UniProtKB/Swiss-Prot annotation:
Lineage of source species: Eukaryota, Viridiplantae, Streptophyta, Embryophyta, Tracheophyta
Presence of keyword Transit peptide: yes
EC number in record: 4.1.3.27
Origin species: Oryza sativa subsp. japonica (Rice)
Protein name per Swiss-Prot or TrEMBL: Anthranilate synthase alpha subunit 1, chloroplastic
Family: Belongs to the anthranilate synthase component I family.
Effect noted on mutating residue 323 to N: Insensitive to feedback inhibition by tryptophan
Name of the gene this protein is made from: ASA1
Transit peptide, residues from-to: 1-34
Length: 577
């Protein structure tokens, strides 16, 4: 897949997907100082930069980028994240996005990785209660909002970003965060109101967004790193002051990446067979019998013509002394995917390896990519080919996929210009680390009177995690699952200053709540005391007329156990040492 402007399909660290990279020994200070010299601009370049900045402000641009390009051979994205966010600062909003792109013949390392920390602004929504924090202006306001997604959109309407040459074709700044599955309740207020939602046992935000002015973009093809700071002119008394402050902020960001005291990453060895499932997960939001009863109930609704399909999920719980960032480092090895993410948000940390976009808008083109239909990977290319044909000849899985393509066409069509919706690709097979999926691509041209936020509202949640018809399926999910889903099956990603959007579907995503618990344990055997974390691994199965309850329950177990292997690896590498 070609790199998209402001896409979050970004790349693994260099060196590729290893646990031990990033430890500098010996002449670390000298390395840092030499690297730092590459950030300097000569006098001519400084004058040119200042001239372009002031010209942009004179033309009415109120958000303007300043950037430096540095060598990246002394730094990895994982280490860069740790330079910006201390190990003990686990509630500081921040993110690391990476990617391995998939295709019919296997995997390719994505071109870009993106790191962000210290958002200038945050939006936190819980049901209809919204808190907006502007850290730059040191202000906070709380308000009731029928649709909190209109708030970031209204803020974006005030933006006039400067478009400059030299920025990479990746996400370079803007909103980053997550949208829970339950944000659908802002749209379907009558059929899916918050008042009728299942039990909210974790009290997580429904939306968390941070506005990131400081961004570090790794280009793994050109072997360089773009360090970017966006300047808000409205926060300063003059353009001159804005430029000088912006330069100082950029230099401060660079100095954190080039500090003499660069943090170290714990080295590790891969001791486990990462292709195997993780340890059995004993604790779930539903017992085996309760889940099987829910499958039977769903089939009754299908046979009655109430729905065609519904996705029933259950949330598994795993306790671990592995830190969430260690789990992310392990997940990069266990399950490299198009949307790798470590996202520290308010109330939780997301560790994700999603294979699928929720929605993408680039230059007003909407993209929806249904991913449904699964079979295991073969042990050889020849076996892969055999299994691929077996998957494409599976009538049940192909019928489900076509149904979801139709749902995708409907979602895109709601916000597209008449006649612009197309199925660009139909039923391609993509290979991932452990499985193969059937994939299709639906596109459309966004209507002139709408924005990317409307495309997100139309898509969320996608049919692959809800069912068909979508709203009726979600009503049944509320009745049968018993707990609010939270981030699972919602989306995470970014919306750029230019208005492009790339949101991944929150599948294969581990949720670590950060709120204190009365039963948290501690380990004092390590050099540093370790806190016990609760990891939530949620997985679902698509229920159709001929579904077998035992098989669907086992599918949930297998999906969650595959994700749990990352926790096993993190424990064996970082905790048990």
């Amino acid at each position: 897949m070609a790199s998209l402007v402001l896409s979050l399909r970004i790349a693994p660290s260099t060196p590729p997907l290893g646990l031990g990279g990033g430890r500098f020994r010996g002449r670390r200070g000298a390395v840092a100082c030499r690297a730092a010299t590459f950030q300097q601009l000569d006098a001519v370049a400084v004058r040119e930069e200042e001239s372009k900045f002031k010209a942009g402000a004179a033309e009415g641009c109120n958000i303007l980028p300043l950037k430096r390009c540095i060598f990246s051979d002394h730094l990895t994205p994982v280490l860069a994240y740790r330079c910006l966010v201390r190990e003990d600062d686990r509630e500081a909003p921040s993110f690391l996005f990476e990617s391995v792109e998939q295709g019919s013949e296997g995997t390719n390392v994505g071109r870009y990785s993106v790191v962000g920390a210290q958002p200038a602004m945050e939006i936190v929504a819980k049901a209809n209660h919204v808190t907006v924090m502007d850290h730059k202006m040191k202000s906070r306001r709380e308000q009731f909002a029928p649709d909190p997604m209109k708030i970031p959109r209204s803020i974006m309407e005030q933006w006039n970003p400067q478009i400059v040459e030299g920025l990479p074709d990746a996400f370079c700044g803007g909103w980053v965060g997550f949208f829970s599955y339950d944000t659908v309740r802002y749209v379907e207020t009558k059929k899916l109101p918050f008042s009728n939602a299942p039990e909210d046992d974790r009290n997580l935000p429904d939306i968390h967004l941070g506005l990131y002015n400081d961004i570090v973009v790794f280009d793994h093809v050109e072997k360089k790193t773009h360090v970017i700071h966006w300047v808000r002119v409205d926060c300063h008394e003059s353009v001159d002051e804005a430029y000088e402050d912006g330069k100082n902020q950029l230099e401060a960001l660079l100095s954190r990446l080039h500090s003499v005291n660069v943090p170290t990453l714990t080295a590790g060895s891969v001791k486990l067979n990462v292709g195997q499932f993780g340890s059995a997960l004993q604790k779930s939001s539903m017992s085996r019998e309760d889940y099987k009863k829910a499958v039977v109930q769903a089939k009754e609704h299908i046979l009655a013509g109430d729905i065609f399909q519904v996705v029933l999920s259950q949330r598994f719980e795993r306790r671990t002394f592995a830190d969430p960032f260690e789990v992310y480092r392990a997940l990069r090895i266990v399950n490299p995917s198009p949307y790798m993410a470590y996202l520290q948000a308010r109330g939780c940390i997301l560790v994700a390896s999603s294979p699928e976009i929720l929605t993408r808008v680039e230059k007003r083109t909407i993209v929806n990519r249904p991913l449904a239909g699964t079979i295991r990977r073969g042990k050889s290319k020849a076996e892969d080919k055999v299994l691929e044909q077996l998957l494409l000849s599976d009538g049940k899985q192909c019928a489900e996929h076509i149904m979801l393509v139709d749902l995708g066409r409907n979602d895109v069509g709601k916000v597209s210009k008449p006649g612009s919706v197309k199925v660009e690709k139909l039923m391609n097979v993509e290979r991932y680390s452990h499985v193969m999926h059937i994939s299709s691509t639906v596109t459309g041209e966004l209507r002139d009177d709408l924005t990317c936020w409307d495309a997100l509202r139309a898509a969320l949640p996608v049919g692959t995690v809800s069912g068909a018809p979508k709203v009726r399926a979600m009503e049944l999910i509320d009745q049968m699952e018993g707990k609010m889903r939270g981030p699972y099956s919602g989306g995470f990603g970014g919306v750029s200053f230019r208005g492009d959007m790339d949101i991944a579907l929150a599948l294969r995503t581990i949720v670590f709540p950060t709120g204190s618990r009365f039963d948290t344990m501690y380990s004092y055997t390590d050099k540093n005391a370790r806190q016990e974390w609760v990891a939530h691994l949620q997985a679902g199965a698509g229920i159709v007329a001929d579904s077998k309850p035992d098989d669907e329950h086992q599918e949930c177990l297998n999906k969650a156990a595959g994700l749990a292997r990352a926790i096993d690896l993190a424990e064996s590498t970082f905790v048990d040492e």
